[in-house]
A protein has these predicted regions:
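Gram-negative bacterial Sec-dependent N-terminal signal peptides
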Residues: 1-21
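Surface-exposed binding/hinge segments that line
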Residues: 131-181, 205
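Short, P/G- and charge-enriched loop/turn segments at secondary-structure junctions
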Residues: 66, 137-138, 185-192, 198-203
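N-terminal lobe/hinge region of extracytoplasmic solute-binding protein
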Residues: 33-87, 120, 196-198
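Glycine-rich and polybasic anion-binding loops at the starts of cofactor/ligand-binding domains
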Residues: 532
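Extracytoplasmic/periplasmic ligand-capture domains
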Residues: 21-24, 65-67, 84-85, 92-130, ...
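Short N-terminal segments immediately surrounding and downstream of signal-peptide cleavage
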Residues: 24-37, 170
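Mature extracytoplasmic/periplasmic domains
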Residues: 339-357, 538-540
Length: 567
């Protein structure tokens, strides 16, 4: 309780801290450290939050989400609505008026052509766009004039605020990326590492999986911002050293994703150099169960693809047994304390969308054993490991290097061992695991394992695009550079049909019911996604840094232009 009070008090003090700007660059260097290093500066080539945060300092969308979940215009004059004529009465078009006078960091004009091009870039079927679900249902994107963009949908769309809204869908400069369409997307190294943007900073040096160096954008539209002349974003550190670099040594101003044990949090707060800030949204630590065979005996290009169904997980009783064996409350108590809560939902928030899905919250070891018995998995030779038709019930369980995740792995392995499942644990450097490199065998998109654990979320308060990631067509595969969003390779035509129906549902109550049903279809009904904990965003902030406004619905750096040094 003391820790909770300290966290809330620190956040309140920070929220009311004064932020005054003398002139652009007057506060010297901003130093950010991430527990996971950035691998790219192009949000469209990565699903990793580490990359999306880093890129958001440079590239901007037409609109962003504020901490209260409401939208704010960024590169647009206003948010299009039915009332102001920006959204058509039939729900089939949305028209954005662009902010006049905006310059790219190279001094050229930002225009509607850049917006249209960005849509073409992501929707190219050969490009492997990691944010393709943000463009779901779009028929065409047109430049009406240099400052007006019209998006037309194939069917009436009740939530047209997806493409170009939030940190996942920024605008790319057409001039820089026009030769990077389709299969060329991932090979445009210069553009992907040093994008020309409209945001407050410009990349001057980028070392993948290590460090990014920025300078203030000389053409940023607010002449007084950013307050910092330069910024350094260092990565590759674990959560503990990231937190220490802010809270104990004071070497850094901001530490992203400081997942550390509750008792250590309290000790660091007592040092008096900083505070931890939290914000609850849709961030869920989960297990993903691979519905395809990841065996290394298969030819490269066929592993973890629909050509080969998983030999064990094709039986839902096995998947259910693995979930039943887990004590989620104990995981949260040991791993997160006040910074998380147990959940069975992929969509735990906002409350209006959260399913009454609580069946997984009580551990049921005997129920898990019974399910495996019914599925025909028994210990025929008495070695403690179940087998069936000569095959051992043996799984590879991978995740990123992180002390809490390794604790979770050890605990879950023991619970699974207790029900007769053999488990091999694998840990991967987070910069590689979340990096999206099509040439690496260790990315979470390739999923060369049976089970993997990570956390993911969506921007904004509407999970429409997030849930649309799990349609059949979005499974990662070699043809799209392994950039698909459907990580477990889940495929259910009924799910796909309900996604399509939801896109055109206007009634809020019916829409909420659809979201709950979609959530249940991938969790308790299919158990391909096994939620563990609804995590708060949890980062360390120096007492010398003001203006930070923790945001659960957008990039944590969504207002980095407003950050400054305490006077």
């Amino acid at each position: 309780m003391k820790l909770k009070t300290a966290l809330m008090g620190a956040a309140a003090l920070l929220a009311f801290a004064p932020a005054a700007f003398a002139e652009r660059g007057s506060d010297g260097e901003l130093k950010i450290i991430q527990s996971q290093a950035a691998s790219t500066m192009n949000q469209y080539l990565s699903s990793g939050t580490k990359d999306i945060n880093a890129s958001s300092m440079v590239s901007e969308p037409l609109a962003s989400y504020k901490p209260d979940g409401t939208m704010m215009p960024r590169l647009a004059v206003e948010i299009p609505t039915l009332e102001n004529g920006g959204v058509s009465a039939d729900g089939k078009t949305i028209t954005w008026k662009l902010l006049p006078g905006v310059k790219w960091s190279d001094g050229t004009d930002f225009t509607a052509d850049d917006v249209v091009f960005t849509g073409q870039y992501c929707m190219d079927p050969a490009g492997g766009c990691a944010q393709l679900s943000k463009f779901e249902g779009i028929d065409k994107i047109e430049a009406v004039d240099p400052l007006t963009v019209k998006i037309s949908f194939k069917e009436p769309k009740t939530n047209p605020y997806s493409a170009f809204v939030g940190a996942l869908a920024p605008i790319l400069q057409k001039k820089q990326f026009e030769k990077c369409l389709g299969a060329n997307a991932s090979s445009c190294t210069d553009a992907n590492f040093k994008p020309i943007g409209t945001g407050p900073f410009v990349v001057t040096d980028f070392k993948t999986n290590d460090v990014a160096v920025f300078v203030a954008n000389p053409n940023y539209r607010d002449p007084a911002k950013p307050a910092f002349a330069t910024a350094t974003l260092k990565g590759g550190n674990d959560a503990m050293s990231t937190a220490r670099a802010v809270m104990e040594t004071g070497e850094y101003d901001y530490g992203w994703n400081t997942q550390i044990e509750p008792e250590v949090q309290a000790q660091m707060i007592a040092a008096g150099k900083g505070k931890f800030m939290t914000a609850y949204g849709g961030l869920v630590e989960r297990l993903e169960l691979n519905m395809t065979d990841a065996s290394s005996a298969l030819p490269e290009g066929e592993r973890s693809t629909a050509k080969h169904p998983h030999p064990i997980f094709s039986d839902i009783r096995v998947r259910e047994a693995l979930s039943k064996a887990i004590d989620r409350s104990l995981l949260v108590e040991i791993g997160y304390g006040e910074a998380a809560r147990p959940t069975c939902n992929l969509v735990p928030a906002p409350e209006m969308f959260a399913s009454d899905n609580t069946g997984c919250l009580t551990q049921d070891v005997e129920g898990a054993k019974k399910l495996l018995d019914e599925a025909g998995w028994t210990d025929s030779d008495g070695d403690g490991i179940r087998d069936k038709d000569g095959k051992k019930l043996s799984l590879v369980y991978q995740t990123s290097v992180n002390p809490i995740r390794q604790n979770f792995q050890a605990m879950i392995k023991q619970w699974w061992n207790d029900i007769g499942v053999e488990v091999e644990l694998k840990q991967i450097d987070p910069s590689v695991f979340f990096g999206g490199d099509a040439g690496s065998p260790d990315t979470f998109q390739k999923f060369y394992a049976d089970v993997q654990m990570f956390a993911n979320e969506w921007d904004g308060t509407d999970p429409q695009a997030y849930l649309a990631q799990l349609t059949c067509e979005k499974a990662p595969k070699p043809e799209d550079q392994w950039q698909g969003e459907n990580i477990p390779r889940f495929c259910n035509p009924d799910y796909d049909a309900l996604i399509k129906e939801m896109l055109t549902t206007a009634d809020p109550a019916k829409r909420a019911d659809q979201i709950k049903k979609l959530n249940d279809m991938v969790t308790k009904d299919a158990m391909v996604t096994v939620p563990l904990a609804n995590r708060a965003r949890f980062s360390a902030v120096s007492n010398t840094l003001v203006g930070v406004d923790m945001n659960a619905w957008d990039s944590e750096y969504w207002n980095v232009a407003d950050w400054s040094r305490a006077k």
